[in-house]
């Protein structure tokens, strides 16, 4: 039986990335939600990677208003793993989060712990081209600055994202041809009204007016991201040793131009896993840091800042 183009394209793409990054003998833990992206990723990996080197984890967010869906999604993921002969690991949040950003943080922390406990070397996620495009457009609209265009790498910091060049439409087609279904979260559309409008209205309207334009836009933003990353001043954060534990050096911050100061602050927030900030937040932080006081404490962008004569630090 001849393989369809969708199957060939996705499986070959994932296999090429595994080979390119020499991952043939690496143990990979798949972050499995039951949605189209993660189901397609898991299925493809079972075809191009050794099954005994694969595992899948479902992260239950806890007893919130969506708990019935979460229970059913976990059961769906467990049955899928049994069908594909993959080890399944259910995890549960130890606390309820207040926002999607907090859930994301809890999820990655739990996945990282499980990875270490079970001897996995990588966590694979189903982030795809449309996810990345929507995120960059949202950050552009909110004025996050150049850091909002940060390149998302296929392989970095123990995370493997092989679907970044694949669209959601291609993933849906792949699942249809594999005769596999997904289990979508009914609350997804309500989580971020702006993202939902971009996905369901603006991007679809753009594609109708100019076929192929969304893919071209995604490529253009990726090119910008790569150019920003490769500029000499791109990594201001790297010039602050031990920034994760000690924060930023205030003396270094004061030598920078206003533009560079905002870039450094954005890089610092991103390094701490903070994403929900805007250009106005960065400008407000700058104003607070302009004061001549040696010791300052304030709260901006959902973070508690502590400043002394030597350091600028966000309290965890």
Curated annotation (Swiss-Prot):
Alphabetized, the UniProt keywords read: ATP-binding, Cytoplasm, Ligase, Nucleotide-binding, tRNA processing
- At the top level, the lineage of the source is Bacteria
Q: Which reaction does it catalyse?
A: cytidine(34) in tRNA(Ile2) + L-lysine + ATP = lysidine(34) in tRNA(Ile2) + AMP + diphosphate + H(+)
List GO BP terms, alphabetically: tRNA modification
Which Enzyme Commission number(s) are listed? 6.3.4.19
Q: Where does ATP bind?
A: 33-38
One molecular function GO term is: ATP binding
| GO CC, alphabetical | cytoplasm
Keyword NADP tagged: no
Q: Which InterPro entries match?
A: Rossmann-like_a/b/a_fold, TilS/TtcA_N, tRNA_Ile_lys_synt, tRNA_Ile_lys_synt_N
UniProt main location, coarse: cytoplasm
Q: What class of enzyme is it?
A: ligase
Q: Where in the cell is it found?
A: Cytoplasm
Keyword Translocase listed: no
* Function in brief: Ligates lysine onto the cytidine present at position 34 of the AUA codon-specific tRNA(Ile) that contains the anticodon CAU, in an ATP-dependent manner. Cytidine is converted to lysidine, thus changing the amino acid specificity of the tRNA from methionine to isoleucine.
Sorted alphabetically, which NCBIfam families does this protein's record hold?
lysidine_TilS_N
The domain section of the record reads: The N-terminal region contains the highly conserved SGGXDS motif, predicted to be a P-loop motif involved in ATP binding.
- Please give the family membership noted in the entry: Belongs to the tRNA(Ile)-lysidine synthase family.
Return the protein name: tRNA(Ile)-lysidine synthase
**Which gene holds the coding sequence for this protein?**
tilS
């Amino acid at each position: 039986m001849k393989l369809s183009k969708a199957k060939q394209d996705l499986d070959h793409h994932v296999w090429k990335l595994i080979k390119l990054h020499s991952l043939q003998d690496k143990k990979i833990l798949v972050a499995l939600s039951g949605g189209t992206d993660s189901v397609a990723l898991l299925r493809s990996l079972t075809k191009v990677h050794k099954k005994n080197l694969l595992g899948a984890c479902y992260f239950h967010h806890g007893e919130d208003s969506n708990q019935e869906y979460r229970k059913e999604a976990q059961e769906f993921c467990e049955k899928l793993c049994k069908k594909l002969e993959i080890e399944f690991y259910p995890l549960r949040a130890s606390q309820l989060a207040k926002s999607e950003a907090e859930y994301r943080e809890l999820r990655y922390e739990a996945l990282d712990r499980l990875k270490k406990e079970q001897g996995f070397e990588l966590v694979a996620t189903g982030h795809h081209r449309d996810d990345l495009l929507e995120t960059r457009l949202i950050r552009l609209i909110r004025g996050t600055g150049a850091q909002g265009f940060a390149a998302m790498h296929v392989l970095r910091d123990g995370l493997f994202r092989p679907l970044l060049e694949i669209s959601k439409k291609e993933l849906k087609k792949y699942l249809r041809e594999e005769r596999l279904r997904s289990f979508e979260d009914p609350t997804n559309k309500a989580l971020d009204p702006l993202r939902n409008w971009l996905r369901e209205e603006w991007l679809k309207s753009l594609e109708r007016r100019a076929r192929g334009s969304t893919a071209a836009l995604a490529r253009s933003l990726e090119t910008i991201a790569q150019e920003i990353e490769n500029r000499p001043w791109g990594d201001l954060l790297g010039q602050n040793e031990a920034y994760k534990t000690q924060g930023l050096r205030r003396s270094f911050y004061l030598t920078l131009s206003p533009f560079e100061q905002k870039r450094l602050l954005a890089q610092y927030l991103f390094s701490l896993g903070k994403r929900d900030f805007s250009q106005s937040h960065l400008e407000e932080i700058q104003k607070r840091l302009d004061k001549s006081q040696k010791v300052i404490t304030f709260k901006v962008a959902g973070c508690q800042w502590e400043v002394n004569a030597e350091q600028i630090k966000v309290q965890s």
